[in-house]
């Protein structure tokens, strides 16, 4: 049975991470949250008051405090910068609102893409982000691009934030998500777009379990054919 690589891309709050984690568990695959890597770089920038021209300082701290992932007792994924658990810190609104400019820095993308490709070499991995199918893993055996309305994505993020205890205004979230869509799809380096051979799936009004089933069936078919 061949171990394949699955790329799931899409805009903010399209369900990428939730779906990817479930499928990874079902298939016994490794899940790599690339968004958490860019959020970690953003956290470094904000914590130190760095700006675009300080990219080398961000890279230096990433080298000194490498990003790693560990499993919590409940099976959830923890994100570390060096020995610091930043799982909750990188999900705060200030990081969310600044991750677009940090992730658009060519030097940051080059370094993190290098790390992502190294992790994916052995296969049996599911990776989600915005440029996995186009840049990170252009030869992935299965590429999915998830979309959903801004209204629905704002509702999902609102619910997530409430559950995490993050103060959130729904209308502000809608505005922020629409603004991030524009930034992500218009940046010069690795803009958000579907790969030519990606399956585009609109998840508006679709349950998580239905999305998981759709993607997992596609994956299992490819695995069985390999």
Swiss-Prot record:
Pfam families, A to Z: Cytidylate_kin (PF02224)
Can you supply a Gene Ontology BP term from the record? pyrimidine nucleotide metabolic process
What does the UniProt keyword field contain? Answer: ATP-binding, Cytoplasm, Kinase, Nucleotide-binding, Transferase
Q: What Gene Ontology terms describe what this protein does at the molecular function level? A: ATP binding; CMP kinase activity; dCMP kinase activity
Q: Name one GO cellular component term.
A: cytosol
Task: Quote the EC number.
Answer: 2.7.4.25
**Predominant location:** cytoplasm
- EC top class named in words: transferase
Entry's InterPro entries? Cytidylate_kin (IPR003136), Cytidylate_kinase_dom (IPR011994), P-loop_NTPase (IPR027417)
Catalysed reactions, semicolon-separated: CMP + ATP = CDP + ADP; dCMP + ATP = dCDP + ADP
Q: Can you say where in the cell this protein is located?
A: Cytoplasm
Where is ATP annotated to bind? Answer: 10-18
Please give the family membership noted in the entry.
Belongs to the cytidylate kinase family. Type 1 subfamily.
Q: What is this protein called?
A: Cytidylate kinase
What is the protein's species of origin?
Answer: Streptococcus equi subsp. zooepidemicus (strain MGCS10565)
């Amino acid at each position: 049975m061949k171990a394949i690589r699955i790329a799931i891309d899409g805009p903010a709050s399209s369900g990428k991470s939730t779906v990817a984690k479930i499928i990874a568990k079902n298939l016994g695959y490794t899940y790599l949250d690339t968004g958490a890597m860019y959020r970690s770089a953003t956290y470094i920038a904000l914590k130190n008051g760095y700006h675009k021209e300080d990219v080398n300082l961000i890279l230096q701290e990433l080298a000194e405090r490498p990003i790693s992932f560990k499993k919590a007792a409940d099976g959830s994924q923890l994100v570390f910068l060096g020995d610091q658990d930043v799982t909750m810190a990188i999900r705060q609104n200030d990081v969310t609102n600044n991750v677009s400019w940090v992730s658009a820095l060519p030097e940051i993308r080059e370094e993190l893409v290098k790390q992502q490709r190294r992790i994916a070499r052995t296969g049996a991995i599911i990776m989600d982000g915005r440029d996995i199918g186009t840049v990170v893993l252009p030869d992935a055996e299965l590429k999915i691009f998830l979309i959903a309305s801004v209204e629905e994505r704002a509702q999902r993020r609102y619910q997530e934030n409430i559950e995490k205890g993050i103060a959130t205004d729904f209308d502000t979230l809608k505005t922020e998500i629409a603004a991030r869509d524009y930034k992500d799809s218009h940046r010069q380096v690795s803009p958000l777009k579907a790969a030519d051979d990606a399956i585009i799936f609109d998840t508006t009004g679709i349950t998580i379990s239905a999305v998981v089933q759709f993607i997992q069936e596609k994956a299992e078919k490819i695995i069985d054919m390999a």
